[in-house]
Amino acid sequence: MSTDKLLLPNGVKSDGVIRMTRADAAAAAASSSLGGGSQIFDELPKAAIVSVSRPDTTDFSPLLLSYTLELQYKQFKWTLQKKASQVLYLHFALKKRLIIEELHDKQEQVREWLHSLGIFDMQGSVVQDDEEPDDGALPLHYTEDSIKNRNVPSRAALPIIRPTIGRSETVVDRGRTAMQGYLSLFLGNLDIVNSKEVCKFLEVSRLSFAREYGSKMKEGYVTVKHLRDVPGSDGVRCCLPTHCLGFFGTSWTKVWAVLKPGFLALLEDPFSGKLLDIMVFDTLGLQGTKESSEQPRLAEQVKEHNPLRFGFKVTSGDRTVRLRTTSSRKVKEWVKAVDEAGCYSPHRFGSFAPPRGLTSDGSQAQWFVDGHTAFEAIAFAIQNATSEIFMTGWWLCPELYLKRPFEDHPSLRLDALLETKAKQGVKIYILLYKEVQIALKINSLYSKKRLQNIHKNVKVLRYPDHLSSGIYLWSHHEKIVIVDYQVCFIGGLDLCFGRYDTAEHKIGDCPPYIWPGKDYYNPRESEPNSWEETMKDELDRRKYPRMPWHDVHCALWGPPCRDVARHFVQRWNHSKRNKAPNEQTIPLLMPHHHMVLPHYLGTREIDIIAAAKPEEDPDKPVVLARHDSFSSASPPQEIPLLLPQETDADFAGRGDLKLDSGARQDPGETSEESDLDEAVNDWWWQIGKQSDCRCQIIRSVSQWSAGTSQPEDSIHRAYCSLIQNAEHFIYIENQFFISGLEKEDTILNRVLEALYRRILKAHEENKCFRVVIVIPLLPGFQGGIDDFGAATVRALMHWQYRTISREGTSILDNLNALLGPKTQDYISFYGLRSYGRLFEDGPIATSQIYVHSKLMIVDDRIAVIGSSNINDRSLLGSRDSEIGVVIEDKEFVESSMNGMKWMAGKFSYSLRCSLWSEHLGLHAGEIQKIEDPIKDATYKDLWMATAKKNTDIYNQVFSCIPNEHIRSRAALRHNMALCKDKLGHTTIDLGIAPERLESCGSDSWEILKETRGNLVCFPLQFMCDQEDLRPGFNESEFYTAPQVFH
């Protein structure tokens, strides 16, 4: 190497200030520059020296000057603290790499010459050494041309280290000028900037400027003990340098740590995308206590026994990771940076996620009633996926058809749809609940095998492992689909058999047209023992009805969607670590930026991609015409979900057929009477319009389910808080209603207490206040109520009636004691029922419509939608894992409450009217009848009257179960015997009717046509003479923990 390469290039003056020309900068190429698409920088960053400081010491050297550098690359800004000695080290590293590469090139020439002479092959090679203890070992990447242009002149660094005599101000000023000049040297050329040495100096990596992971924070080499040896990119295990082995010990592994808003990621090296580990910060552990004002910390320095070791630890959830670096100063920097990244501010309801939509941040929501529209919307979203799909559920069936009739849409079967997307390169992550097989028959192992065999891009985990975790009683109950971090679906609908339904809630499908094979589902009659022959019927369609399914689901866009994705990532990583820690094909996931909570960012810009713009007046409501809250006529770009544009002509008329005169009519037939938009289509009652809303994700999780440091019960807190603050009206649909009053010590959730207190407050204030609750008429488990194998059904009935109407513990008993008959003015309970013929000219049958919704609407302004039931399992946080969303309207329509003007929310009001129109059998022109939900004309004369009339008709025609007049097991057996004698065959809940009624001689079908909608009264006195419905000692359920049932 010629000595002239060490001389100052043209443009450097004798005053020591570097003034590089563009030509000189271009000639200084970086060593080990990454080629092509592997570069970190694709344009030059900018750097400025903010300040220069000198130590307080008389023995001063310019090498001790400290520089605060502010750097900017595109929209990313970050600050570095560097000493002059580190800059000198950078310079020597660049020079050394140039020498090594030239020697390597000469060595190859000598090797070829010796080989051509046939003498011997050179053994060994130039060994690379690390520049400093926290550098990484990376392979060299160079070309012949790049070697020629890799000179970084040594004299360019001399002004930084040249001894300076004079006043401190002069030293600092000249140091600033010299440093700025040297920064200009290696920041003026992309090859130099993308070198390993410069990227390490700037503390950047592949993740630094990935916008989806948020702002640029601290990065650098650390060593960790909990990882195995890291394999290098060439297959060689990446170990510590020789001089570090004695320092750290062979069990410590060097990794590149990347701190981002909300998580700490450990990579193999800065230029590798391989994620070795990740800690997603657990906000619950940061809440602290009211007694202590000290801010809890994520990181803290560790006192090492060896004074030459410098360590710290990071704690999040149930994990603690120990790390080491090369100096005490770096430990302090890391501890400070991690604590700043996890700085906590409390969230409403104690949730991990903040309220979204307070500004115009893109938070939007859309509701779906029943599986028909929800499944089609999910299918549409999956079809348009481009990068990643996350899915989790209590039960998932790969052979589920997302659009019906099923024979017309084979490509929209779930497994086929996922296979298509996986082959297109979309990564699909599916998290299944691993059931206790003796208790449940959902066969998640079969689902896992089917899904794994689809394609290598489909990754599947089942969790928990019951033996190792000790978790036998609780389940993962969330129902989530997330597509490209852009849209997510949550609510009550699992992607499994039995859930697909329409507003008609047909009870028959013979021959199969809508519900193939085991999708013709009635768990009251029979649960399949095997799900492998999915197209084979479990039930005789000519004898047994299916059990119709009523549910509510929603889609979310914007930051709420990414909060849901953060929850999925947390659960996935927790399951991966516990279930498949050594499975290389199952990766860890990193949360995207919008999943990161604003408190992690402090005063930083919250959204790098598109900063949120505050509304002009966020407190000013947006008032819409009432019909806008129902219109589905938005442009396609506003609603990127599937809105059915036409109805299959034969779809509505096949199968049974419920022909009752009270059924909802086509909106088009009453357009002259309706105040709705003319664009309302046939499905107006099943899908809402995409709306700007305030949304907050709430959940139930704990250490076993998500690895959190303590249980989160934000769903429970949200329910209680919203009930307490309701002004006029609460509407609840839920699969269960099991709760306790304050004096209750068995049932621990306090939803019932909140309702009780709110009703008493309304009574004391003499104000109109209504609570309407819709739940299943019977638990959706196999077995007749009097059957020996139906202990689960009876146990659930026990706890539910204990909450609703039984003496001593129930809300109705306690309210009746204070209010008497006025109790029903405040609160009432209902169920849903449907009827039809099992096939053309077949028997008349009925079945309860199984209410599986997990919904609460408050004052037509706030809606809670999710997976959580009202029971201890779902609400306490330490049991089943759940997720939900509180949706608060930002756009309003004029309505009324008890005859007074009321601004109802577009989302909540339209959803409530959709549900009520379905339950009451209203058509489009009758929406005004339910505009005011609490006035007597609606609540008593329409809602309660319709339920009572329908109930009386069903009792007259079927004498079906449950029945207000059946109050003991003896009466139940008597009723069952009479029906079987008359009909010869009936269902487990007496669901078959004679063609003509002997009591009046009337045609049963004609009488049933007098019903309207599906609403019926909940039988409060059913089995009330049976003191205890809990399992007896001769039943296996007796030996199960009681908490399983409530």
From Swiss-Prot:
Disruption phenotype: No visible phenotype when grown under normal conditions. Shorter roots less sensitive to exogenous auxin. Reduced gravitropism. No effect on root hair patterning or root hair growth. Defective in the hydrolysis of phospholipids, reduced capacity to accumulate galactolipids and premature change in root architecture in response to phosphate starvation. Decreased accumulation of phosphatidic acid in roots under phosphate-limited conditions. No effect on the concentration of phospholipids and galactolipids in phosphorus-starved roots. The active site is at H477, K479, D484, H852, K854, D859. Residues 45-205 form the PX domain. Hydrolyzes glycerol-phospholipids at the terminal phosphodiesteric bond to generate phosphatidic acids (PA). Phosphatidylcholine-selective. Regulates vesicle trafficking and auxin responses. Required for the normal cycling of PIN-2 containing vesicles. Contributes to the supply of inorganic phosphorus for cell metabolism and diacylglycerol moieties for galactolipid synthesis in phosphorus-starved roots. Involved in root elongation during phosphate limitation. GO terms for biological process: cellular response to nitrogen starvation; cellular response to phosphate starvation; galactolipid biosynthetic process; intracellular signal transduction; lipid biosynthetic process; phosphatidic acid biosynthetic process; phospholipid catabolic process; regulation of vesicle-mediated transport. This is Phospholipase D zeta 2. Belongs to the phospholipase D family. PXPH-PLD subfamily. PANTHER family: PHOSPHOLIPASE D, PHOSPHOLIPASE D ZETA 2. SUPFAM superfamilies: PH domain-like, Phospholipase D/nuclease. One of its GO terms (cellular component) is membrane. It comes from Arabidopsis thaliana. Its EC number is 3.1.4.4. Induction: Up-regulated by auxin. Up-regulated by phosphate limitation. The lineage of its organism: Eukaryota, Viridiplantae, Streptophyta, Embryophyta, Tracheophyta.
